Amino acid sequence: MDSMASPGKDNYRMKSYKNKALNPQEMRRRREEEGIQLRKQKREEQLFKRRNVSLPRNDDCMLESPIQDPDVSSTVPIPEEDMITADMIQMIFSNNAEQQLTATQKFRKLLSKEPNPPIDQVIQKPGVVQRFVKFLERNENCTLQFEAAWALTNIASGTFLHTKVVIETGAVPIFIRLLTSEHEDVQEQAVWALGNIAGDNAECRDFVLNCEILPPLLELLTNSNRLTTTRNAVWALSNLCRGKNPPPNFSKVSPCLNVLSRLLFSSDPDVLADVCWALSYLSDGPNDKIQVVIDSGVCRRLVELLMHNDYKVVSPALRAVGNIVTGDDIQTQVILNCSALPCLLHLLGSPKESVRKEACWTISNITAGNRMQIQAVIDGSIFPVLIEVLQKAEFRTRKEAAWAITNATSGGAPEQIRYLVTLGCIKPLCDLLTVMDSKIVQVALNGLENILRLGERESKQNGVGINPYCALIEEAYGLDKIEFLQSHENQEIYQKAFDLIERYFGVEEDDPSLVPQVDEQQRQFLFQQCEAPGEGFQL
């Protein structure tokens, strides 16, 4: 079979032999919002690194302090040297450049020194934030520009209301102009500020994008030879690409792909991590967006980075690869052609549960593909490890492995399904029938149904009349569990359980008590209460 089948053939193939309970859209599962909110926390951590410069040595312990809500800081006594003084206010509004610089530095130190900088106190002083913004325009005084940019960066690292103050004072267009400053310190601080602003929420992100940040930002990334500037600029770019509710305007952010594809070959793990995060955001969408990412030529390098020795690179690279294989069979094949399966097999053995889970999710979208792609997973010796995961891993990882197995039983050829049975997939699928997660119970039922359907077909062809897989399910206590599911609160589950028993395990006609009655008013099956299977429910 041609692995590059046309979409039309693909749809026909899906409809003709795949389990009707799992349509192609369900089998290929887009990523749900899992809260990789990038990353107010990360921005706070970066600001901690910046604040370290002004921390006295005996205050190093503050680095271990938890990040608190800015409101908490109002209850903490502020040392006298950390107060906003009348002299500071007077100097910042003076016409003397030296006094302006001295006052701005004092404000910057206040906003940099503590884990809980007095942002509220600063923004409540009338005209102070506006004064910082005014100083951004002082091209003849780059030191004042830098100090003002630093102060505004730290204000924008706070809550949405703090960030909003910076936006409303008109700082964003000026920061964007400063990306082309001839002073690298000013450039770096400007891009850091813009990253903080864009990273707050979708509204702030879109405001920054609509101010036409991308051309000067990409120019900065192309021309800068300073590693810290590149790190901050890539991080800001990743924040511009981030978000799903709503996502950024793809036409505004997709021009960054050429620069990202070049930066994928950076030797710096921080740069690589944020490049991969940006690519994961851009590929998290419909197939037309996935195709644009593929066309930028990043796939082979993303797959190579799955084997990187730093998990902060591996995790976003895996996320991006996983998003790409949510596309159609042809898009999935691009990743397979980059030798992704040996890398995914390696990641199934990762000590990090989150990586194992993500690898299973990625494989589940590959096994939702065509039979040649399922065969590639078989040839890669991945299914034995998946079945072990299905038996032993944490539940969230077992769920993804269950999808991978069931997808293969839905789209696989008879010999491929028989292979899964010989590996022992029936017992762990039966074990999932007692979990509390209704969706996974349905996935397990679908997998077992696909196996039983094949057995029925084989028994008719062989003229034996006995479905060989019924006995295997009974031996795994699966029949007891399926019978119990006839009293499940979920209608689809109890209907499926009833159908499986009726079709494959038979109901004795002389035992009418086993046949569910129908409530004519509610049009629902009425089942007798079954005793729970001996093993009970699992969490």
UniProtKB/Swiss-Prot annotation:
Region (NLS binding site (major)) residue spans: 150-242
One GO CC annotation: nucleus
ARM repeat residues: 76-118, 119-162, 163-207, 208-246, 247-291, 292-331, 332-373, 374-413, 414-456, 460-505
Annotated Gene3D superfamilies: Importin-alpha, importin-beta-binding domain, Leucine-rich Repeat Variant
Keywords: Cytoplasm, Protein transport, Repeat, Transport
Region (Disordered): 1-38
Motif (Nuclear localization signal): 45-54
IBB domain mapped to chain residues: 1-60
Subcellular location per the Swiss-Prot or TrEMBL entry: Cytoplasm
Entry keyword annotation includes Nucleus: no
Molecular functions (GO terms): nuclear import signal receptor activity; nuclear localization sequence binding
Pfam families recorded: Arm, Arm_3, IBB
Comp. bias regions, Basic and acidic residues: 26-38
Function noted in UniProt: Functions in nuclear protein import as an adapter protein for nuclear receptor KPNB1. Binds specifically and directly to substrates containing either a simple or bipartite NLS motif. Docking of the importin/substrate complex to the nuclear pore complex (NPC) is mediated by KPNB1 through binding to nucleoporin FxFG repeats and the complex is subsequently translocated through the pore by an energy requiring, Ran-dependent mechanism.
Domain comment as written in the entry: Consists of an N-terminal hydrophilic region, a hydrophobic central region composed of 10 repeats, and a short hydrophilic C-terminus. The N-terminal hydrophilic region contains the importin beta binding domain (IBB domain), which is sufficient for binding importin beta and essential for nuclear protein import.
Quaternary organization: Forms a complex with importin subunit beta-1.
UniProt similarity note: Belongs to the importin alpha family.
The name this protein goes by in its record: Importin subunit alpha-6
Record organism: Rattus norvegicus
